[in-house]
Every structure is written in structure tokens, then in C-alpha cells.
Amino acid sequence: MTHEEHHAAKTLGIGKAIAVLTSGGDAQGMNAAVRAVVRVGIFTGARVFFVHEGYQGLVDGGDHIREATWESVSMMLQLGGTVIGSARCKDFREREGRLRAAHNLVKLGITNLCVIGGDGSLTGADTFRSEWSDLLSDLQKAGKITAEEATKSNYLNIVGLVGSIDNDFCGTDMTIGTDSALHRIIEIVDAITTTAQSHQRTFVLEVMGRHCGYLALVTSLSCGADWVFIPECPPDDDWEDHLCRRLSETRTRGSRLNIIIVAEGAIDRNGKPITSESIKDLVVKRLGYDTRVTVLGHVQRGGTPSAFDRILGSRMGVEAVMALLEATPDTPACVVSLSGNQAVRLPLMECVQVTKDVTKAMAERKFDEAMKLRGRSFMNNWEVYKLLAHIRPPVSKSGSHTVAVMNVGAPAAGMNAAVRSTVRIGLIQGNRVLVVHDGFEGLAKGRIEEAGWSYVGGWTGQGGSKLGTKRTLPRKSFEQISANITKFNIQGLIIVGGFEAYTGGLELMEGRKQYDELCIPFVVIPATVSNNVPGSDFSVGADTALNTICMTCDRIKQSAAGTKRRVFIIETMGGYCGYLATMAGLAAGADAAYIFEEPFTIRDLQVNVEHLVQKMKTTVKRGLVLRNEKCNENYSTDFIFNLYSEEGKGIFDSRKNVLGHMQQGGSPTPFDRNFATKMGAKAMNWMSGKIKESYRNGRIFANTPDSGCVLGMRKRALVFQPVTELKEQTDFEHRIPKEQWWLKLRPILKILAKYEIDLDTSEHAHLEHISRKRSGEAPA
């Protein structure tokens, strides 16, 4: 962005006014969006107004519409719900109510409206916009507004952000609040699992989501449930027999518990509701199992927003302001949404229409169509769930292949989930699956055993690495590794791990020249808290680490708020990769985040100190600074702490905190469980195909570059990339990819922390159309 363009961003909002409101059911992360809209609005020079109590506040006006300041959105990020209040509003549905709302906006000169809510709230906003000119002429006729006021406010711009825990809005992969709701559900499922195992019970859990089965589906994937009932795909007519057979099979395999997940809108093929109680009665009557029902209810809306929702809310809020300020009378009202990890703008009414089409398809019992309309992400979740839950492994192993799975590098939450799904999908395909303990070292020493179906039972929710993981690379022990590949007849290798898994893969490729035994297909599933594996935008375990850092920062900020005038300097992990520091900075509302990828000088440190000195003069008397562990060898955490302590004398005092290895622990978040499960399934499917492809003269021989890949999430899809091709994109000295997508989120961090920056202010999304997205551009 040139200096002039940047200057344009900072003056884009001058003379304009934006109102922000939250409507409909509340969702965690709405506050992050409100905070971003307010701060970016102020950054561009616009005036920003809070509308309290949703549309009701818009209709009632007066004290309900208040101007927001920079400080008024401080300490909001970590709060659940919506601070400015929300209400379901009857008045706004009537034209009379909308007339009053228009009057209130015109009087304040507000012509830009940012609505955060579900599909109902967004449809209401669009109606309001289409009637705007008629409403103004009515107000003018009635003498409530002058001709001048009418001309000044001659059109209304609207942008929507989807805040709903149900994730039922078409066109966006994740709505604000969905991830946090999954956190609440998984916390409960984990807690119930322990008591169910003690008593050998069956639990029926009912989750929210109205007519959308997303929460139920992802929960089932994330906890390895025995059965799930979702409205989009009712069970076959003989489901009662099938369910009971499935539950008793699980028990005979040695499981001590059964978990059944029910979406509140679940129905059978005839459209008759399936209730939790009816399922309980069925299980008790047919099988005599001790069965309990737990209806989760409004717990799912509560609690602290997850790191994902805070970042999502913040990114969407920034994009919303840009969309409003760039809008013209001819641009359609748009929704800012997420596709893969990219912000996109979609026409509001197209999204609403598709969302209505789903309801219509379900009412007409066209369930396949409803599934398709939900998008590719939903379909993928369903396919993987069906594979893992409903298909029995074949008894005979004729024509089977032998695949080995291992962990390499440092432990990361979600590794076990990846191993579980790899093992089970492998068994379903009729393969022999071996697990290797302690990484390449174990492969060399022959610490290898065969895994059966129940070997990996209950692994999804367990943190760390149950197979054991080491950073050792294979080169030194090619002899022993080759011998064991022959001894155990290993025909394919799935490596779950971090940067070492990738470099180990490269070494295996080089070793193929000397050792024929190494000519077997292998795939790397990136799993590391640092998120520094080339070929993937995300790695398994990073989301869990991010939430751990966030939780700690929240507690630290609370302590600082109590003591006043205190600045905390926190050191995060990540090696040379600044992903954790940047994303945690965004999610925890840090004043600065120092990273290796963005070199900084003593002058930058000085600017930050001066910035904090200014901040202490406002009502917000605390600071939070994050520092990546290897961002600079001389400006260490101690150095920065000493500098801040000296410069802040008499104005603020400083404290430091090194988070350390707690970032590698904890039980995996729903995102990591789900991501790992899907990656494992995808890797095993690829592996089966590759082995068949490389089968020649009774043995496996794979020596092409595409037989050694990294499986990664790239923008909107899961892709396999040959490790040799990724070599060019890697900075081996610092163990990071040369290009990293999240660096473009850095300016948002700075704007939200009130820095006057000369940088591109936004990742800039262009208006797209939803039909294109449905035809297969959604992420996997």
C-alpha cells in the first residue's frame, strides 16, 4: 500500500457515522467484533455509535444509541455474550417500528449500519435498507425531518456479520460463536466420559442448533460418539435395530461407555421428531443398559469466547468497516464471512436465500439436497463420521497392505486424534496398521506393534503423544530403518509431527538413492504448536496452544487491571515462528507482539514504551506485551523487561512471565480434534491409493517425488504437496516457511492497539458469489 493509499484509509471515514448492533441470540465472540468495528471505525476517522438492545434500541432511540469511544470497548474481548445487549424485537418487524428507527438514525446522521446476528436479523436489515428511501419520504411528509436531512442521509449501507452458535448460515464456514459453543460441549462430554466409564453407562446428550446439525456432527467427530442424530440426514427406517446392535458391539469390544449425540431438531425419515427421552427408553427396554440423558441447553451460549472466535470476530469486524466505507448506493448489502482462512464478502440476500433453501429442502424431505446446500465442509465432516462410526472392519486381511504410523518432533495436542483416525480408517480399508513408538528412533530400534480397532479407543480427547515422540532424524540410522521396513513388511509410512517430520521426510527422499527399502510412499501430517511446517496454513496442536496462551493472558490482564499501572511481558513458544505470539496478541488484545519475521529495533521498543506511557493516562491502566521466544537473540525477554522497568519508572511497573511447556499440554480443542481426525482419514485414503499405484512385480517401489508428501490446509482446501517441492519455500536455518499467510493480520493487531501505522490496513476481500463457493471451493 502506498503512503497515499494508507492516508486514504485513515481518512476514509471522515464525516461518516457507523452504528453497530447485536441482534437475535447471543454468541461468544460478538464483543470481539463490536470492539473491532468501533476501533477500526475510529481509526478511519468515522464516528461510531453503539445501539443497545439490538433492533429494539434502534426503534426506541434516545439513550439506546450512544457514541462509542476507544476506551469504551476495552476489556471486552474476553467476555462472552454481547456487552451492548441483544433482544428479539417485534416492533422492528412492523413498518411503523422501522419508520421510528429510520428517524433516529437520520437525526444522528448515521448512514452505515453493521448488524451482528443470525439470518433473521440480517434479513431484517436488508428489508430496512430496501425501504429506506420510502421511509425517508414518509418522514419528510410528516415533517419529522427536513429536506436537507433527507438528502444528507439519502442511502443506507448495510454489512452483516454472522453471529450464531448454530453455524447454520450458508456461505460462511464458521459463524462467530460456533467454535466457543463446541468448546463448551466438548468440556462437558469429556467430563461425562469419566463418570460413564466408572459406571459403564450410556449417555444421550442433546445439543443445540435448531434445524442445523453442525454442532452435533462436529461433537460426534471430536469425541468419537457411537451415534449421532442430525436433522439433515435422518436415520433409515430400521435405525432402532441398527443402533442397539452398534451399542452392544461397542460393549463387546471392551468399551465401558456409549455416547449418543442428538441435535435438538433431529427427525426420522417421516419428519417425526426423535427425542433424547425416546432414545433412552429404547436403549433401556432393548438392552437394559444404565442410560442417562443430559440436555446441554444454554450452557453452550455461555463462557469465555475461544481464541478462534476472538480472532474471527476481530477480522470480520475490520473487514465490515472497510466494506461499509467503500460501499456505494449500487453495491448490494454484503455479509463478511470466512472461507478456509480467508475473509470474503458475499451478497447478503444470496446467503439468506440459500439458508432458506435448506429449510425448504428439509421441509420437503429432500435430505440429500439439504446436505449439499450446507456446503462442502459439512459434507466432509459427515463422510468422515460415517466411515469412522458405521463401517465394520473386514474380517479377512486378503490383499491388504501394511501401513505404519508414527509421531515425530515435540508433543502437540491432537496427535492422538490423528493416529486414531489413521489406524481406524486403515483397518476399515482392510489394511494391517502398525504403530511405531518414539519416532524415527523407534523405527530404527524396532519398537513397532500392530494396532487393532480398540487399541486407539478414546484417544481423540487425549493430549500429548501416546505413541511417544522424539526429535531424532532418520539419516544416521538408515541401515536399521531399512532392515525394519523389510522385517515388518512396511509398505507405507504416515508421519504425524512438526518441522522434524518434514525434514525427516526430506531425508527419507534422499536416502531412496542408496536404500531401495526407503522407496515406499510416505505422508506428513503437520502437528506442532509452532505452526511452522511448510505446505500448510495450520498445523494440528496450534489451536490448543493458542487457547492455553489466551486463557493465561486473560488471567494476567485481570491481575493487571486490579493493580493498575502495570505492564506484563509474556514470552510464548514457537521457535522462530511468530504465529502463536501474533495470533495470541490478536486474541488477547495485546499492545504489541514481537516476532522474528518482523525485525524490530530499539527505536520500535521505545515507541511501544511511549505508547504505554500515553495509555496509562487514559482509563485503561494496564499493558500486555507478547514476545516470541526467538524473536531476537539480544533483545531477550529480560532485556525488554529491564528496558520497560527503567523507562516506565514512576508511570508503570513491569512484570514478566515465561509460559513455557504448558503450551504443549492440555486436552485438544474441538478444532484440533476435528482437524486431526479429518487429516488422518485423508492421509490414509491417499496412502491406500499410492500403495496400489506403486505396486510392481509383487513389491512396492515408489521413487517419484509425489510419493512423499506433506498434507496441508491451503487457503480453502486440503492438498498433498511433494516434500521436495516445498524445499524451495523453506528457511531451514530458522525452521520456518518463507511465506506465511498470517503476517497480513499483523496490521490489525496494531490498529486495534491504537498505533498510527503506515501499513496496508486490511487483507481486503472482494465480493464473491455464493454459487461459485458451493460448487467446491469450500475448505475440506
From Swiss-Prot:
Allosterically activated by ADP, AMP, or fructose 2,6-bisphosphate, and allosterically inhibited by ATP or citrate. PROSITE patterns: PHOSPHOFRUCTOKINASE. Residues 2-390 are annotated as: N-terminal catalytic PFK domain 1. It catalyses: beta-D-fructose 6-phosphate + ATP = beta-D-fructose 1,6-bisphosphate + ADP + H(+). InterPro entries: 6-Pfructokinase_euk, ATP_PFK, PFK_vert-type, Phosphofructokinase_CS, Phosphofructokinase_dom, PKF_sf. The modification Phosphoserine is found at S133, S377, S667, S775. The keyword Hydrolase does not apply. Residues 391-401 are annotated as: Interdomain linker. Glycans are attached at S530. The keyword Flavoprotein does not apply. It is found in: Cytoplasm. Keywords: Acetylation, Allosteric enzyme, ATP-binding, Cytoplasm, Glycolysis, Glycoprotein, Hydroxylation, Kinase, Magnesium, Metal-binding, Nucleotide-binding, Phosphoprotein, Transferase. Its EC number is 2.7.1.11. Its cofactor is Mg(2+). Mg(2+) binds at D119. NCBIfam families: 6PF1K_euk. Belongs to the phosphofructokinase type A (PFKA) family. ATP-dependent PFK group I subfamily. Eukaryotic two domain clade 'E' sub-subfamily. Catalyzes the phosphorylation of D-fructose 6-phosphate to fructose 1,6-bisphosphate by ATP, the first committing step of glycolysis. This is ATP-dependent 6-phosphofructokinase, muscle type. The gene is PFKM.
